[in-house]
């Protein structure tokens, strides 16, 4: 996909991102989670500039995502996968690149035991992350495996039910 973006400038790409509808109560729920003392972040296998834009919009604390490379504001079509996704000796799954590895990094960085982490995901790429989080929440997912391993499942386009689990 990155090669299809080659030659486009960041302003063009962000205008497309701006058209993607967010879950309506996202900002409200993030605000409430932060009031409760939670650190809120975006871990995405999409591109960092998209995740960073969302982070800023919802006032999240961090973002970790793949880096679409730019030269003078123009996409080069190349992508860097941050080392946080890479398998290490501490990895709990066998994938070479996995969001569960990012979860371990976040756990160490913020000194939060994995059992105290709530992870929310919607695709097959979130399975390991949800599996190893304290509470794994499947959000509006059609993936049967993700739904089966999740501790909780949300089937409506609202993040408010997360507040019931985030005490």
Predicted regions and their residues:
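C-terminal cap/substrate-recognition subdomain and adjoining C-terminal extension
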Residues: 17-42, 46-167
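N-terminal helical cap/lid subdomain that shapes the substrate entry/recognition surface
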Residues: 1-12
């Amino acid at each position: 996909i990155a090669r299809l973006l080659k030659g486009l400038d960041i302003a063009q790409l962000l205008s497309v991102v701006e058209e993607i509808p967010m879950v309506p109560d996202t900002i409200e729920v993030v605000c409430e989670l932060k009031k409760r003392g939670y650190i809120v972040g975006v871990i995405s296998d999409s591109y960092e500039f998209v995740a960073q834009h969302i982070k800023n919009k919802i006032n999240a604390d961090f973002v970790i995502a793949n880096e679409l490379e730019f030269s003078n504001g123009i996409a080069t079509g190349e992508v860097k996968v941050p080392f946080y996704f890479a398998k290490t000796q501490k990895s709990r799954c066998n994938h070479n690149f996995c969001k569960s590895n990012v979860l371990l990094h976040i756990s160490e960085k913020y000194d939060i035991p994995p059992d105290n982490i709530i992870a929310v995901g919607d695709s097959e790429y979130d399975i390991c992350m949800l599996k190893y989080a304290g509470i794994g929440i499947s959000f509006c997912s059609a993936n049967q495996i993700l739904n089966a391993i999740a501790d909780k499942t949300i089937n409506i386009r609202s993040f408010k039910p997360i507040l019931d689990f985030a005490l």
